[in-house]
């Protein structure tokens, strides 16, 4: 009586399984690479916008500080003992404004290299986090300077009847106009800093 023999070939299925697993891994790597490239391009666009905003903010803050620094007016009439003159250095708040906004402008210049790094390496977290924290601190300083100066400009235009403070802008019109321009410029820079912080927060968000 002849013996029956059974042959089981398991080599081919193993090969197919390995090939399938390699294909799955390659597909995952490909998808990850495409997602990273898309995220990097998106964040690079944000970084370029961030850099342009900083350049614009530098011009605005330098202009605001310079305009306030030149705020001065002397009335065409005077007495033997008194000359009617108004300048930014007559108000401690305006002096603080000039110094604070000058510091803000200097910070913006120093922040440009970090902004460039985020363009070159859009997925880098450290430079973006540094900018986010620093911008938040400087935003506080800018807001304080602009708000303090705005209160003095308001008093110069309207006075205060409760304390018998008379408005001076009817006499020192050019001085008040110059100071008001500086405050408006500083307020615009505050809005720019808010945008910069929002950009950094979006760039740090994980996809």
Curated annotation (Swiss-Prot):
Modified positions (N-acetylalanine) in chain numbering: 2
InterPro entries, sorted: CASP/CASPL (IPR006459), CASP_dom (IPR006702), CASPL (IPR044173)
GO biological process, one term: cell wall organization
Positions in the Cytoplasmic compartment: 2-44, 117-128, 203-207
Transmembrane segments: 45-65, 96-116, 129-149, 182-202
Extracellular compartment segments: 66-95, 150-181
Keyword Protease: no
Keyword Acetylation: yes
Subcellular localization, as worded in the UniProt entry: Cell membrane
Bilayer disposition of the protein: Multi-pass membrane protein
GO CC terms, sorted: plasma membrane
Chief location: membrane
Keywords annotated in UniProt: Acetylation, Cell membrane, Cell wall biogenesis/degradation, Membrane, Transmembrane, Transmembrane helix
Subunit comment: Homodimer and heterodimers.
Family of this protein: Belongs to the Casparian strip membrane proteins (CASP) family.
Function: Regulates membrane-cell wall junctions and localized cell wall deposition. Required for establishment of the Casparian strip membrane domain (CSD) and the subsequent formation of Casparian strips, a cell wall modification of the root endodermis that determines an apoplastic barrier between the intraorganismal apoplasm and the extraorganismal apoplasm and prevents lateral diffusion.
Name of this protein: Casparian strip membrane protein 1
Organism from which the protein derives: Raphanus raphanistrum (Wild radish)
Species classification: Eukaryota, Viridiplantae, Streptophyta, Embryophyta, Tracheophyta
